[in-house]
Amino acid sequence: LANAEARPGVSFRLGGFETPLDGRRATVIRALNVLRQYDESEVEAAWATMRARLAPGGALVEGTCNEVGRVASWVTLEATGPVTFTISLRLAELDAPSIVAERLPKALIHRNVPGERIHDLLTTLDRLWATHARLGVYGPTQRWIAVAESLRAEGWPVLGARSRWKLGELTVPWSAVAPA
């Protein structure tokens, strides 16, 4: 099926983390819902293998999403390692941002426990989502924007601006959620 979408500049190959590219390097490698089946101890090696296949300035996007892509999170990595962590939520029926906990990348999914930064982030997002419930009358987007602004005001290093938040996205540096 994927080969039906091939066109100049876009191709699909069967392969693993080694990313077979016939001697070329990838600008972007997107690996969603791949590492979930692996042990957490295997993540670093898989990341290193894929990062080694990146062109200078290239990026690896590794994460997980639900079946229809409405709840997702990913780590963006460069040649030197993880750079950012992003969550993306369909805001229309969102009960709590922590729904993303079941779709965290393998490097974080077992770290959503008290004392870990990812747990702190998700707990804070839920608290702020509840705090800004009154803004729901203006729509979930306005509520999410208020959450992002409040998160930043509380000292979280939220990256980006309203243009991404309107899409239900929120990005922080990897260091803000990296396992302790």
Language-model segments: which ranges?
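A short acidic, Gly/Pro-enriched loop at the edge of an enzyme's catalytic core
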Residues: 18-29
